């Protein structure tokens, strides 16, 4: 895994790389978690923190309605919107698919961790309590405010996986 995870994570963190390559790297990391989650454990905390950072920095809140005006604060001009189809080499990290990929990775990592704990693995969780609190806050914010509906739903699912992992770690798996 030393040959795979660090270079892929370096691509994800590099803002000079096109968003499509960053998403592909996240997808490959998710496949690593899905294929053999024990192998990714040495990197789990760094990856989780990195993806929470990415989600926090690259979140794109929906336009709000100005008080008393009844219309959005956006002027309705969508010329600045860039899609991956029209510009596949875009480095715009605010695109929803990048957030979706990060949320998918986090969900898989949390689900795999929950399964390992339920199997009675001697695995010690690399996730400190502060990371759970931060992840919960970021996922709640994204699920409530993101401009993209799919991202909001995926954030809710990731938050549910986080809740299940916390419950399992506390021995409440039968209640979750």
Q: Where are each of the predicted segments found?
A:
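Positions within the helices of HEAT/ARM-like alpha-solenoid repeats
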Residues: 17-22, 62-63, 94, 98, ...
């Amino acid at each position: 895994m030393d040959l795979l995870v660090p270079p892929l994570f370096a691509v994800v963190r590099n803002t000079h790389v096109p968003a499509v390559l960053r998403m592909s790297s996240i997808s490959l990391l998710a496949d690593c978690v899905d294929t053999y989650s024990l192998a990714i454990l040495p990197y789990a905390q760094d990856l989780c923190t990195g993806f929470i950072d990415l989600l926090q920095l690259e979140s794109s809140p929906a336009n709000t309605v100005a008080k008393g005006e009844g219309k959005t604060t956006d002027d309705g001009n969508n010329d600045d919107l860039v899609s991956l189809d029209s510009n596949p080499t875009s480095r715009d990290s605010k695109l929803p698919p990048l957030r979706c990929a990060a949320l998918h990775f986090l969900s898989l990592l949390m689900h795999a961790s929950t399964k390992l704990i339920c199997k009675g693995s001697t695995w010690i969780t690399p996730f400190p309590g502060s990371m759970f609190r931060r992840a919960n806050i970021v996922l709640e914010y994204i699920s409530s405010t993101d401009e993209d509906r799919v991202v909001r739903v995926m954030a809710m699912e990731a938050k549910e996986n986080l809740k299940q992992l916390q419950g399992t770690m506390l021995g409440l798996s039968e209640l979750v």
